[in-house]
C-alpha cells in the first residue's frame, strides 16, 4: 500500500553554485558512499549526481510529510546505483520500502519518491526472490 509520494525539482546549476560556495554542503548532504560515487564523476555528470541526490532526499521529506532534521537526517538517507544504473534509496531505521526515480533534462533534475508499506507476503517474497520483487 502506498503511504507517501514526494516530488522535487532543482536547478543543477544552483546546487553546483552552493557546492562551490560551501564546501561543507557535500559532507552534510551526501553519505560517504555517495561522496565516493560523486568523486568518480567529473564536471556536468558530477553536478547532476549531487543535485539528483539532494533533490531525491528533498522528495523523500515531502513523501513522509516531515522535513529533514525532524525525524530523519541527511546522512540517514542513502541513494546508490545498482550496476544497471537504477538508483536505490535506503533509509536508516525506516520501516517502509522506498522507490526513487531521478531524471535530468537540461539544467533541471526532477525526482519522485514513493513510500510503500509492504504486506507480510511481499516481505517474504523479497527474502526468497530478492531480484524478482522490490529491492530492500
From Swiss-Prot:
UniProt entry tagged with the keyword Metal-binding: yes
Cellular compartments annotated: Cytoplasm
Catalytic activity: apo-[ACP] + CoA = holo-[ACP] + adenosine 3',5'-bisphosphate + H(+)
Main localization of the protein described in the UniProt heading: cytoplasm
Pfam families on file: ACPS
Gene Ontology CC entries for this record: cytoplasm
MF terms in GO: holo-[acyl-carrier-protein] synthase activity; magnesium ion binding
Superkingdom in the source lineage: Bacteria
Protein's name according to its UniProt entry: Holo-[acyl-carrier-protein] synthase
Gene it is expressed from: acpS
